[in-house]
Design a protein with these regions (language model features):
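N-terminal Rossmann-like NAD(P) cofactor-binding module of classical short-chain dehydrogenase/reductase
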Residues: 15-16, 92-95, 99, 116
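Canonical Rossmann dinucleotide-binding motif of NAD(H)/NADP(H)-dependent dehydrogenases/reductases
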Residues: 2-40
Length: 130
């Protein structure tokens, strides 16, 4: 007997950042399993292709869209948000999962500390822009 989900996800669109591994990959896979169209966001093309293949192996009828963006730069976040808004009439679910571990002090081209830019500024900006 199949269990009916509390919130049906068929015909819903979900965007998952950091979707190429770990929690993000599992989240994207399970959203797809529940029938959502999933936009996978990652920064590494090889890992993104592997993530897409892994999800399709588990959920052959998954509807996936892979986007490559490095969220450490707010200019990339703005570009991605505009692209998503142009391509989709509605975004139902946003999973801000992308993050990095702090390492040696690294400053982005926009002048922000790398982990602060990725883990905090991009989340705030993406949520507000979408």
């Amino acid at each position: 007997m199949a269990v009916s989900p509390l919130f049906p996800l068929q015909h819903k669109t979900a965007l998952v950042t950091g979707a190429t591994s770990g929690i993000g990959l599992v989240t994207a896979r399970e959203l797809a399993r529940q029938g959502a169209r999933v936009i996978l966001v990652g920064r590494n093309p090889d890992k993104a292709a592997q993530a897409r293949a892994a999800i399709l192996a588990a959920v052959p009828d998954a509807v996936l869209d892979v986007r490559l963006f490095d969220l450490a730069l707010l200019s990339n976040v703005r570009h991605m948000a505009a692209e998503i808004q142009g391509d989709y009439s509605q975004l139902d679910i946003l999973v801000n999962n992308a993050g990095i571990m702090p390492g040696p002090l690294t400053v982005t081209a926009e002048g922000h500390e790398l982990s602060w830019a990725t883990n905090h500024l991009s989340v705030f900006a993406l949520t507000n822009l979408l």
